[in-house]
Amino acid sequence: MLVKSLQTCKICGAENTRGNHFGVQCCRACAVFFRRRAGTKYLRLKCLSVHCGEAARFCKPCRLKRCYEAGMKIEYFQHNRDSIKSSSIAQIPRSFANIVGRPSLVIFCVPQDSYQKTFVDLNSLVGKASEIFTAGPESPYIGLTQLKKLATFSNCSKEWAQTRFKTISHGEMSYFWEFYFLRTAKWLTYFDEFQRIPDEIKIKLLLSFWHVFARLDKLITTAKARKLKLCSQQTWAMSNGLILDFDRTKVDFSDISNYPTEDLFYFLNSITALDLQPQVLELMELEVSDMEFNFMLAQLTFSYAGKRFQGDILKICDRFQEVLSNDLHEYYVKEMRTPRYSGRLGKIMKINNAIQNDIWKNRPRGELAAIFNVFKVEFSHPEMFIDTGFVRN
């Protein structure tokens, strides 16, 4: 039988030690003692007991001295190994009172305008949209279905150059507004049913859902760009080739608000679509075609407008959706040879519903921003920015 030799502690002489501690073969008691007393006042003290050393008993100064003489080193101490932190850094809870700088006792008082607001005249932009509706589609296309005509305008499958913004201010933001507003108008000219309605309803619908169009367009383009590894998980891509990295891009909104930029994103969360990262992953997995993409755009925008206005506009939007739904059915059955497409269509509708739910969820934030004058801008057409965070609904 093999007998394992017992090792003694080099500090106190105890038998059957439990291994090497801080560079020395010792017992656990001496290891714990050194961990607690190393670097303390006992280094400077002299022996405290006349019986020190008897029966392997040492006073604290002598025991600590023997630890150092045996070769124990504080450099072997290990820190921050606890799975649960023993203490946490206290932070001031985030609240609306902290953001607007008003105490909760008076938070429900509607303040007066404390500064001059910047007026944004959108008449020229709306005029351009009217001209686009009058001129009709840029490249007339005789398609079998209206959904195919819409798909001819979409450049979802085309390559696009990458341009990264280093700084975003109110100037760049107004460029985004103009791009998506006019892009939505041009897209609508390819829909024959839309071209048949009165001009005033065309403008009313465009003013209401251009930003909804922009949300889905950004999600689709971002999914495609990430699939091609053209941008990272922290960046967002637009269909005009621009890439936004909120971790690296400097955002300056000082011209439209007196509040810190990091607080403004709370109110602009709906239009930035930062909550829709899971939907981007779903779109990457689905790899929607141009036909499906345009159906998603139409269903999302017309459904949003119908719920917002009700009445006759709801009937018009329902008719639009019915026409395009029939076209999508024909696309699946005749072109894709997929008569059982309910599963894929269900995933597509789930994404659209998530976008609409995100809009409804963030709507109260826009109400708060308007009540407490978070943004110092005033628009000639405020209905254009409902559900964006800039104006009150």
From Swiss-Prot:
Domain NR LBD: 121-388
Source organism: Caenorhabditis elegans
Keyword Signal: no
SUPFAM superfamilies hit by this protein: Glucocorticoid receptor-like (DNA-binding domain), Nuclear receptor ligand-binding domain
Family note: Belongs to the nuclear hormone receptor family.
SMART domains: HOLI (SM00430), ZnF_C4 (SM00399)
Pfam families, per the entry: Hormone_recep, zf-C4
Single GO molecular function: zinc ion binding
SS bond partners: none
One GO cellular component, as annotated: nucleus
Statement: the UniProt record of this protein carries the keyword RNA-binding: no
Keywords annotated in UniProt: DNA-binding, Metal-binding, Nucleus, Receptor, Transcription, Transcription regulation, Zinc, Zinc-finger
UniProt-recorded name of the protein: Nuclear hormone receptor family member nhr-90
Residue spans crossing the bilayer: none
